[in-house]
């Protein structure tokens, strides 16, 4: 059996927005892989970059343990990993080089690796796993164990979803599908997590402690902009009773005050959610939790089942208040469904957050104002606002690929640069984002609507909107200006 150092490259301290947000979670997918490798009999160490100040502990582990293999397995459940940030790619490539210098064989896996294995292989990785990569990983490791000096090409030979360097090219043997291995691996390796460190960050910033879980993998819907490098359009759902039992374990072992379900879509089927609610009660596993879902899945029965299971907050991909934009995104939902979902969840006592996306192809000022109107009418408790971000493997990326310049990835999560020829410049969308955040903050947590203070703040906010809109022509991008001139 092999000695393996498992790690990831998301350093919270390199992403200023997330430092201020102060909501770090242990790398769930990485910890699941640790559990899988332990079950296979390997000796496994773990480096968690999330709370690390720098690479010192990683370098210490390399020197002290002298692992035969260093596996970079990014947290596929973390939306920050899915964003493929340039800062984290640089961190990973530096860590790969150090591992090679320490004499280890290196395997790399994750969303960015799947999209662009070349940079990781050129940094020194022997192999890049394309997609989830678990089945391929469990075939590669015995080859390494029996022949530690095997070439990268020999290690990858005949395996789907494994890339290696052929000359200067990254060569991949097909694409692997998501495996059924993770549910069989048992619990994630929670014993290796610095729980005191995570708890301290949460308590200091928010006064409560949250941990993460996942009840499913993947999403079957086909929004044009949604990158799915790991699971594609598959949706693999765990047994509801097993999820409740895991929640009970976390409750007994670490006493979190809250659970974040990192699923792209939690529950999906109302019968599953109802079974989960019953299992939570039976196991005395109840912990308030937050989820992500879709507006068209929130029936009255679904809202009630979520309430019974302990859901306290649901995030909906509203995206836009313009039906024209939603249709262009192939979102498959309507503005009316978003409003109805908000109302049903509110009636069930569940807070609602909206994900809003600005700047999609063809979005005009009227569409942005329709989104503003949706926020005023639906009154979500919270919002997250981003701009359209073209990532490889999406229809959206294919449509705007020719417009991309030298910058193909955001540097960190608050970047919000427009990397294609949208209607407006990045500064305009950042201003709209700020106004929308302030509007929702006023609606959900400000002074009473009838008070003088509320009217004063609303008047100031309306004035800021007017000032921005009066200058909107100046914020139009060059292609948009050219179209107007034509």
Language model features by range: what are they?
Residues 49-52, 265, 294, 321-330, ...:
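Conserved strand-turn element in the central/C-terminal portion of the radical SAM core barrel
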Residues 117-122, 302, 362-377:
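Catalytic cores of alpha/beta
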Residues 25, 188-355, 373:
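Radical SAM [4Fe-4S] cluster-binding motif and immediate context
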Residues 12-16, 80, 115-118, 221, ...:
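Flexible glycine/acidic-rich beta-alpha junction loops that bind and position SAM and/or redox cofactors
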């Amino acid at each position: 059996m092999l000695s393996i150092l498992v790690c990831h490259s998301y350093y919270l301290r390199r992403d200023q927005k997330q430092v201020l947000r102060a909501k770090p979670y242990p790398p769930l997918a990485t910890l699941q892989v640790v559990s899988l490798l332990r079950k296979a009999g390997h000796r496994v160490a773990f480096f968690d970059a999330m709370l690390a100040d720098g690479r010192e502990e990683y370098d210490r582990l390399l020197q002290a343990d002298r692992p035969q293999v260093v596996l970079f397995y990014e947290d596929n459940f973390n939306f920050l990993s899915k964003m493929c940030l340039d800062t984290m790619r640089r961190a990973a490539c530096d860590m790969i080089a150090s591992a090679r210098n320490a004499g280890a064989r290196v395997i790399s896996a994750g969303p960015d690796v799947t999209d662009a294995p070349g940079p990781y292989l050129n940094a020194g990785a022997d192999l890049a796993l394309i997609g989830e990569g678990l089945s391929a990983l469990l075939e590669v490791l015995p080859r390494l164990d029996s022949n530690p000096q095997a070439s990268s090409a020999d290690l990858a030979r005949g395996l789907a979803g494994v890339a290696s360097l052929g000359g200067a090219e990254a060569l991949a043997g097909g694409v692997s599908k998501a495996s059924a291995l993770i549910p069989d691996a048992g619990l994630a390796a929670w014993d290796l997590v610095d729980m005191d460190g995570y708890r301290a960050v949460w308590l200091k910033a928010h006064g409560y402690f949250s941990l993460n879980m996942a009840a499913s993998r993947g999403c079957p819907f086909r929004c044009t902009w949604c990158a799915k490098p790991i699971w594609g359009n598959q949706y693999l759902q765990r047994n509801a009773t097993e999820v409740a039992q895991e929640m009970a374990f976390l409750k007994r072992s670490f006493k979190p005050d809250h659970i974040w379900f990192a699923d792209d879509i939690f529950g999906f089927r109302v019968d599953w959610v109802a079974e989960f609610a019953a299992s939570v009660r039976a196991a005395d596993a109840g912990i308030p939790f937050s989820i992500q879902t879709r507006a068209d899945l929130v029936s009255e029965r679904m809202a009630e089942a979520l309430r019974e299971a302990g859901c306290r907050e649901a995030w909906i991909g509203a995206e836009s208040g313009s039906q024209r934009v939603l249709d262009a995104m192939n979102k498959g939902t309507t503005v009316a469904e978003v409003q109805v979902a908000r109302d049903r969840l509110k009636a069930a006592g569940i807070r609602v957050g909206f994900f809003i996306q600005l700047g999609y192809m063809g979005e005009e000022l009227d569409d942005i104002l329709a989104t503003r109107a949706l926020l005023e009418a639906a009154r979500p408790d919270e919002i997250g606002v981003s701009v359209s971000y073209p990532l490889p493997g999406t229809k959206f990326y294919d449509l705007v690929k020719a417009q991309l310049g030298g910058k193909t990835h955001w540097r960190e999560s608050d970047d919000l640069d427009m990397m294609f020829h949208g209607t407006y410049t990045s500064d305009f969308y950042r201003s709209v984002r700020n106004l929308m955040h302030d509007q929702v903050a006023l609606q959900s947590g400000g002074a009473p609507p009838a008070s003088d203070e509320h009217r004063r703040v609303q008047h100031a906010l309306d004035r800021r909107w007017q000032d921005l809109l009066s200058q909107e022509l100046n914020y139009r991008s060059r292609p948009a200006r050219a179209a107007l001139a034509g």
